[in-house]
Amino acid sequence: IAEENSGKLVALVRNNAKLIAEKQNLDYIISDGPPGIGCPVIASLSGASLALLMTEPTLSGIHDLERVIAVCRHFGIPMLVCINKYDINEENSHRIENYCYQQGIEVAAKIPFDNVVTEAIVSGIPVVEYSEGNITQEIGSLWQRITRTLK
C-alpha cells in the first residue's frame, strides 16, 4: 500500500511545487528523488527537463546508476551524472566514467569526500555557505553546468 501511495505523494508534491514556482516566477524546480527505480523515482522523473543522477563509486552505486539510466532513457529524460565521494574508490569512479562515456552521458562533476559536509549538516548550514573549499567550488561548477544544460 505504501509503495502505491508514495508515487502519488511525489506527484502531489511536484504539482504543488509547480504552482508555487509559477506564482513566484521561479526558473527552476529541483526535486530530490529517492534511490532505486520504484514508483517514487518514476513519479519524481515524470515531466522532468533534466535528471541529475547522483552516484557513489560502489558496486551498488554502479548497479543503481545503470538501472536509473535505463528508466530515464525509457522516458526520454536528458541526464547528467555526478559522482559523489569519487575519491573513496577511484577504480570504480573510472568504471562509472567509462560507462557514462559509452552511454553518451556526461559526468558533470566529481565531488570529493570531505568531512566539511558532515560539519555543515551538523551545523544545519548548506555546505556552500559553510565552506569556501574545493567541495563548494565543485558544487558551484556543477550548478553552472546544470543551468547551461537547461537553457
Regions found by a protein language model. Give the residues of each.
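Flexible beta-alpha connector loops of hexameric P-loop NTPases
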Residues: 1-7, 59
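Switch II (G3) loop of P-loop NTPases
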Residues: 5, 12-41
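Short, surface-exposed connector motifs at secondary-structure boundaries
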Residues: 25, 48-52, 75-81
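Structural motif
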Residues: 30-32, 52-54, 82
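A general structural motif
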Residues: 33-38, 58-66
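Inter-motif core of Ras-like GTPase G domains
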Residues: 38-59
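C-terminal lobe/tail of nucleotide-utilizing enzymes
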Residues: 71-151
